[in-house]
Amino acid sequence: MKMLVDFLPIALFFAVYHLSDDILLATLVLIPATLAQVAFVWWRYRRVEKMQLITLALVVVMGGATVIFHDAAFIQWKPTVVNWLFAFAFLVAPLFGGKTLIERMMGKAIALPAATWRRLNLAWVAFFIALGAINVYVFKTYDEATWVNFKLFGMLGLTLLFVLGQGVYLARHMPRDTLSQNDHQKDDV
């Protein structure tokens, strides 16, 4: 259910845009939808992830600028800004506490050598930088409707492919005892 709630604002943005061909109207729907999403997550789980707060702030600021100035470039830059902020966070996180951000998120579930965590983390940095750059390329090169489609399907598809690749990488680099321990835990359930 959480994934559905996370996906709802962009799905509404996409639907409103394709029903109206009006990016300003779609942005006007996106802002309260994102606010409602974060409010629901807080109400339901009593915590909101930093990523959701950053996204909310950028939707309000850049979406607001899109509406106020009647300029779609602001909302089109938002995915790039979000991705580049994430890349920066993944890059500098080891300077604060020694662990990579990916290890902080997944380290309790998976035991990996420090070098593997660093490579995974750098892969995420590269992915976020590339995704931000691809977004700029798409909105600068193609029409608005193509960008809206890319925002939903292209970015989601690229992210799913990257996560699948990460899964393959993790499976190849997990210590054998971790794999067998996880298999035994599954058998116990």
Swiss-Prot record:
Q: Could you tell me the superkingdom of the organism this chain comes from?
A: Bacteria
Alphabetical keyword list: Cell inner membrane, Cell membrane, Membrane, Transmembrane, Transmembrane helix
A Pfam entry, by short name:
IspA
Q: Which GO terms describe its cellular component?
A: plasma membrane
What InterPro entries does UniProt report for this protein, alphabetically? YciB
- Which family is this sequence assigned to? Belongs to the YciB family.
Q: Briefly, what is this protein's role?
A: Plays a role in cell envelope biogenesis, maintenance of cell envelope integrity and membrane homeostasis.
Q: What is this protein called?
A: Inner membrane-spanning protein YciB
Q: Which organism is it from?
A: Chromohalobacter salexigens (strain ATCC BAA-138 / DSM 3043 / CIP 106854 / NCIMB 13768 / 1H11)
Q: Which gene encodes it?
A: yciB
